[in-house]
């Protein structure tokens, strides 16, 4: 069996929408018995009182049960922001009807599959930016893609993907026309990544829209008959050729809970 293509997401979902990080609050150093505090210094607060009020500087515990069992790719660190560059995809009602048909059939093979909440096509891996890098990073992106025009693309090939750690599996629709435009955009995004000493995109990327996902490596169940049957549903769906044709009109960068849009000309 050939290796499944990789997706460029972090393994965590909702937590990436907020600042990543947890920092341990430095403990107060104790004094010798009977030693007076120096002028201007506060007396140390007893531990019994400190434990009544947990430090607000400490980040949340990374509980995978709270985000569908997903495992974080990189650890929380205060001041680090998970960052992703992509083209958003606005799903029409007919697209969601097709998605429902695909998901219903795929769940007969892998019942734990769930639908994606939003749709996009990745132009980068998920990387970590320091907070003070965000605006310079976004400005560099804007400068790099300023000359690009909107373009049409088609996504009508069903494909199974995993993340790098093989902790999540995705059902996606691969780009079958417009691939060269995506490569040109990735080349510019990669140059920005290199300027900030960040990971570039995959060498031979498979541009796609992820439709559904599940925890774990489900390739064995989904490749073969399941994949062929899903492709049949797409091919036979009414007006699927027109339905799965779309325009790339903007590039978006998500960094923590911040979104930056860069319209194409």
Swiss-Prot record:
Gene Ontology CC: intercellular bridge; nucleoplasm; nucleus
Residues engaged in binding UMP: 164, 202, 206-210
Keywords, sorted A to Z: Hydrolase, Lyase, Nuclease, Nucleus
Transmembrane residue ranges: none
Record GO terms (molecular function): 3'-5'-RNA exonuclease activity; lyase activity; poly(U)-specific exoribonuclease activity, producing 3' uridine cyclic phosphate ends
Gene3D superfamilies (alphabetical): Cyclic phosphodiesterase (3.90.1140.10)
GO biological process: one example: U6 snRNA 3'-end processing
Compositional bias of kind Basic and acidic residues: 20-32
Catalytic activity: a 3'-end uridylyl-uridine-RNA = a 3'-end 2',3'-cyclophospho-uridine-RNA + uridine; a 3'-end uridylyl-adenosine-RNA = a 3'-end 2',3'-cyclophospho-uridine-RNA + adenosine
Active site, per annotation: 120, 208
The keyword Transcription is assigned to this record: no
Binding, AMP: 120-122, 202, 204-210
Keyword Nucleus applies: yes
EC numbers: 4.6.1.-
Region (Disordered): 1-67
Pfam families (alphabetical): HVSL
InterPro entries found in the cross-reference section: Cyclic_Pdiesterase (IPR009097), Usb1 (IPR027521)
Main location: nucleus
Intracellular or extracellular location(s): Nucleus
Subunit structure: Interacts with PLRG1, CDC5L and PRPF19.
Protein function: 3'-5' RNA exonuclease that trims the 3' end of oligo(U) and oligo(A) tracts of the pre-U6 small nuclear RNA (snRNA) molecule, leading to the formation of a mature U6 snRNA 3' end-terminated with a 2',3'-cyclic phosphate. Participates in the U6 snRNA 3' end processing that prevents U6 snRNA degradation. In addition also removes uridines from the 3' end of U6atac snRNA and possibly the vault RNA VTRNA1-1.
Family of this protein: Belongs to the 2H phosphoesterase superfamily. USB1 family.
The protein, known as: U6 snRNA phosphodiesterase 1
Lineage of producing organism: Eukaryota, Metazoa, Chordata, Craniata, Vertebrata
